[in-house]
Curated annotation (Swiss-Prot):
Top-level taxonomy: Eukaryota, Metazoa, Cnidaria, Anthozoa, Hexacorallia
Gene it is expressed from: sdad1
Alphabetical GO biological process terms: protein transport; ribosomal large subunit biogenesis; ribosomal large subunit export from nucleus
Keyword Transport set for record: yes
Organism: Nematostella vectensis
Similarity section: Belongs to the SDA1 family.
GO cellular component, one term: nucleolus
Bias type Basic residues, positions: 644-666
A UniProt-annotated Pfam family: SDA1_dom
Composition skew (Acidic residues), residue ranges: 520-537
Location of the region described as Disordered in the Swiss-Prot/TrEMBL record: 517-549, 561-587, 615-687
Record-linked InterPro entries: ARM-type_fold, Sda1, SDA1_C, SDA1_MD, SDA1_N
Designated name of the protein: Protein SDA1 homolog
Key word RNA-binding present: no
UniProt keyword list: Nucleus, Protein transport, Ribosome biogenesis, Transport
Superkingdom to which the source organism belongs: Eukaryota
Amino acid sequence: MKERKSSKMPNNLPQLQNLIKRDSDSLIHTCFALSQFLQQLRHYQSNLQIFKLNPSHTSKVLQELVMFLCQVAHCYPGHLGSLPQELKDLLHKHHSVMDSDLRMTLCRALILLRNKDLISPTSILELFFELFRCNDKVLRQVLYTHIVTDIKNMNAKHKNNKVNSTLQNFMYTMLKDSNAVAAKKSLDVLIELYKRNVWKDAKTVNVITTACFSPVPKILVAALKFFLGSDEGSAGDDSDSESDVSYLKFEFLEMIMNSLASLLLPKHKKKHKQTSVNFSALHLINDPQGFSERLFKQLEASTGRFEVRIMLMNLISRLIGVHQLFVFNFYPFLQRYLQPHQREVTKLLMFFSQASHDLVPPEVVEPGVRTIVNNFVTERNSHEVMAVGLNAVREVCQRCPLVMTDTLLQDLAQYKTSKDKSVMMASQSLIQLFRSVNPNLLHKKDRGQPTESREDSKPLDYAAVEAKDYIPGAELINYANSTIILLYATLIPDGWETDEGCDDGSDEDGWIDVQHSSDEEQEDEDPSGENQEGEEDGQTRAARISQMRILTDEDFKKIRMKQLTKEVQPKLGKKRKRATTTEEPQGSRNELVALENIEGIYKKRKHDKASRLETVIAGRQDRPKYGTKKKAKMNEHAGTSNKEKRRKKNFMMMRHNKLVRGKTKRSFRDKQIALRDSLLKRKKSKI
């Protein structure tokens, strides 16, 4: 009975908390709970004054009272209106000298008040960013998780632009904070919110660009990894090497729940199908030219680790290739690293290829190509080095074809007869590239069979643009097979002649009757249309169709397929018919260069024991048993001949035979004569 009475005493805070939260209509019950609450509130205020006298002293009673008041704060908003501000002031003034347990309790209390929507998000989040300066790894991880989750929940239904703008401006100042840990965690928050599509805008990206010029290597590497696309797992990598195992478990469970929901709920599946376009962060930078120039200036003065300089080179080359920038000093800077013995030389070749584009002057890139050829494509190097050099030259010429000269190209094309397959294939790929880009640079025997697309395309000069007033390939579509041609009568030029025999009613309506698309098959079979199409010029017909017809997606698909046919099939006569392909054409070239395109050389790998056994077993199939290749006997029961017996007889038994003892060897004179005769015979054969 004493235990039951003691459970209702005011010192039992969980019981009092349950009593206050419980919904009861009893007036006596409500008055008792209020009196007990006011008593605990006065107790909290007295303990708070004691704590302010000695902030470094730990107080378990104060921790319990703070959590109790935060749990029931929504029940008595009038009495606890100043509680959030008091807790924020305590953390703001004494967080550096405060006990770690008490500091964690106060932070959890503020998180609880924020979840109850009793405190504004801006003030508490700014305080939490300042608390990143604390030397407490567990606290930083809790604050990081809450900040990301809270901002994500605020923007779940609609974008809260006012709060987002305030927080982004505050994070911009936090990235310049003198405390490296606080700046690193602030950067991790920005990157995580961008990855979760919460703050995926240009302002966030341009705030992250400021971290690329940080003197702290960890902040610099995190920002570079973000722009290079390898920022997974960098959110928890601070000065104390924090691990985010709980977060990974949460992500794994969320992935499982989403997969189950997509199977059970059709609405959930439709929701996930509506995804926005994922633009790269490099396209959202406001001033890519100035950003790349500042990065290159930092790279020239950098004395840090080689891995960090490699990442800077990669980012600069991507910016130049994506935005087609002009950073002319970057090419001679890379040129000094283009040596076969250089560390990470394949990546450096990839950076040089990425930085090449059509708008850069050829005389700027040509020295680098010459350096690659002189240092890599030589007989003194191994076959792998030569193949890598040829692949790098091909990637550069694919983006800037004008850097190649006919003399250099014809010299590189001679490696197509190399005995090494990797060098031979790399040379053939270079020849194949210039067959489509500029076949005039190749030797006549290397140009291959001319195709229709090669006749239409011509090499352009530097900075020349081929502007067309028609859709290339539109002449391949039958003009009569119109699906959507609705021309209003007022849009018809006055110079056009109309048919006198047409119905007057059609002119009054203002629309032109168009043949239905269901008649396409019948018109395709009409050979007269094909003869008329052949007599008309291709460009004139393409311009007329582009102006008079609204092309659909199926029409563009047919154009791409027929253009691919023109690239593959040779140029034939007009009356020669050819079969159309059904394959889809490849897309346009990527803005970035894949490392596999340079390292992709043919190399015969060594077989392990399992693969060798498979080869041996496969070779034994449909093959007679192993054994001697002697001729089969005419009679299986017959014995051996005397000649075979003498050959197989033991030498010790034959050593006393007169044939063995009487055997004479050639004298020295006989050997001289034989040597002279052989030399004379060899000399005559050469003549």
